[in-house]
Amino acid sequence: MAAKKANKKPVRYRMHVKKGDTVQVIAGSDKAKVGEVLAVFPKTSQVIVKGVNLKTKHLKPRQEGESGQIITKEAPIHSCKVMLYSTKQNVASRICYTYTEDGRKVRMLKKTGEIID
């Protein structure tokens, strides 16, 4: 006897960082590095930050007579290991969501009060 599937609502993944944000790494081997978010993966809660978590990949030669290559590439890190970074005051901060006078919902840094969006 097969069980009926319940009507599940689609899962909505919410991230505190977006592509293009400037973030600071707060944990791991790349701690205190600052970089720009290149890509966001909400399903796994991971982000790729420019110049952080570099991995080397050895590529075989494609054709005969061609030499192989060694490529360094950024690997994803978990989003809980990064904080938004204020370039004006050089400080990392958590974010909160507020509304502007015209009713738009924006992200704001808690330490500095700087509006990001």
Curated annotation (Swiss-Prot):
Keywords: Ribonucleoprotein, Ribosomal protein, RNA-binding, rRNA-binding. One of its GO terms (cellular component) is ribonucleoprotein complex. Pfam families: KOW, ribosomal_L24. Gene3D superfamilies: 2.30.30.30. One of its GO terms (molecular function) is rRNA binding. GO terms for biological process: translation. The keyword Transferase does not apply. HAMAP family: Ribosomal_uL24_B. NCBIfam families: rplX_bact. Belongs to the universal ribosomal protein uL24 family. Part of the 50S ribosomal subunit. This is Large ribosomal subunit protein uL24.
